[in-house]
Amino acid sequence: MSNIYIQEPPTNGKVLLKTSAGDIDIELWSKETPKACRNFVQLCMEGYYDGTIFHRMVPEFIVQGGDPTGTGTGGESIYGRPFKDEFHSRLRFNRRGLVAMANAGPHDNGSQFFFTLGRADELNNKHTIFGKVTGDTVYNMLRLADVACDGDERPLNPHKIRSTEVLHSPFDDIIPREIKGKKEKNKDEAKKSQSKATKNFSLLSFGEEAEEDEEMVNQVSQTMKGKSKSSHDLLKDDPKLSSVPVVDRNQGEGDFEDSDDDEDDAEDDSDREAEKAKVRENIAKKLKKDKTDEEKSSQDLVKKTSRSDELRKEARQLKKELLAIKQRKEDGVKKEEDVSEVGDSKQNSEAVTEYLESRKKYDDMRKQKLKKGSGREAQTLALLESFKSKLSSAISETPSAPEEDVEELAEDDDKGWMAHVLHFDEQSRKVKDANMQDEDTFEIYDPRNPVNKRRREESKKLLKDKKARR
């Protein structure tokens, strides 16, 4: 494991993610992947990842986040468009704790990123590795995977990124956009101020008159608040207006109320009866429709069942026919095999009977044998004595005949070999000279042999003489 860290290049830059699972320290490879690191650092400065969830989790593979929509299809880069992949020969998906850009294809990087939970060689040269998780925060990163997921790899209770903090920025020229500030301004503008506006009448040339009119209007509005306004209320000093009301309010209200109540009761009764009749008609229509639908469905079921029964019967008949055809074929093959077996049995019957008889004979002999012990030893000695007597009787019974006749008897009779005498040619015991060349001698070359030494010395002398003559 140590050689893996030696192969990785040094980091430059550090970011802290504060998540619901704990803090996660990320060190960046800003020299090897400058575009991806600049994008990640600026988005963290702008608070782009604040409140986003880790929307995808594959056990022992990856945990993915960085999408503000939480769907897995959103997110934009700081460049306004997807930026290119950045691969490096010393950055490989060979362990857990690596941070890489998520994409939907080549050169399609936005704001989404993922953490690796193990070795993932199949992602090499497909996703840009721009950082790694350091220290004990790796265990907080692993806690992101301790959630239950549905069939689409979405966590049921996903973890969130609460806030981000850039501890060391490798890029001094980054100017964060005011995305977070704009949101706060919009919220403040949405809240309406409840403080009342004050009018400064001293700025007007007719300020005193306007101020008096304003006071009169305020008094009238307060007195007539919640009431209908008429000329009797506003123009109290007008002599043309009579002080006697045209209609008595109490009397008029009582008459109107009685007549209105009677009319309303009659209208309500008629409306209720009409509504009841409509409801009854609708219920009757629905019942008729339900009955017709049930009848149609029952007829369809009967038709379907009858059709299915017919198909089943046809299938059964076809199966029976196929089985009968197979049985006929098997019977014909069996008959042929029986005929061939009968012919073979006639030929092999004699050999089989002999084999069975001999096997039975040896089985009986094996049964007669005793087990290990004193009885077994006595039996073997008895067998040895019987063999000796048989051998001596065979030698005494055989007549003196020439050797050729003895060999013929040994071949014909099973006991002839007992009277056979071993004869072999006598080999000559003459001593052979090693220096004599004969067909039976072997050529032996040994440099230590005195004969070979003399030959070498003689050949050396001949060579010296030839050189001296020249």
Swiss-Prot record:
Q: Which Gene3D superfamilies match?
A: Cyclophilin-like
The UniProt keywords, alphabetically, are:
Coiled coil, Nucleus
Where is it localised? Nucleus
Where composition is biased (Basic and acidic residues), the residues are 172-192, 230-240, 273-337, 356-367
Q: Where is the composition biased (Acidic residues)?
A: 254-272
Disordered: annotated segments = 172-377, 428-470
**Gene Ontology CC terms:** catalytic step 2 spliceosome; U2-type precatalytic spliceosome
Tell me the PROSITE patterns matching this sequence.
Answer: CSA_PPIASE_1, CSA_PPIASE_2
Which residues does UniProt call coiled coil?
Answer: 281-332
Domain (PPIase cyclophilin-type): residue spans on this chain: 11-166
GO function terms (MF aspect): peptidyl-prolyl cis-trans isomerase activity
Any matching Pfam family: Pro_isomerase
**InterPro entries recorded:** Cyclophilin-like_dom_sf, Cyclophilin-type_PPIase_CS, Cyclophilin-type_PPIase_dom, Cyclophilin_A-like
Q: What is its main location?
A: nucleus
A single GO BP term for this record reads: protein folding
Q: Which PANTHER family match?
A: PEPTIDYL-PROLYL CIS-TRANS ISOMERASE-RELATED, SPLICEOSOME-ASSOCIATED PROTEIN CWC27 HOMOLOG
Summarize subunit and interaction data from the UniProt record for this chain. Part of the activated spliceosome B/catalytic step 1 spliceosome, one of the forms of the spliceosome which has a well-formed active site but still cannot catalyze the branching reaction and is composed at least of 52 proteins, the U2, U5 and U6 snRNAs and the pre-mRNA. Recruited during early steps of activated spliceosome B maturation, it is probably one of the first proteins released from this complex as he matures to the spliceosome C complex. Component of the minor spliceosome, which splices U12-type introns.
Its annotated function is as follows: As part of the spliceosome, plays a role in pre-mRNA splicing. Probable inactive PPIase with no peptidyl-prolyl cis-trans isomerase activity.
Q: Which family does it belong to?
A: Belongs to the cyclophilin-type PPIase family.
Question: What is the recorded name of this protein?
Answer: Spliceosome-associated protein CWC27 homolog
Underlying gene: cwc27
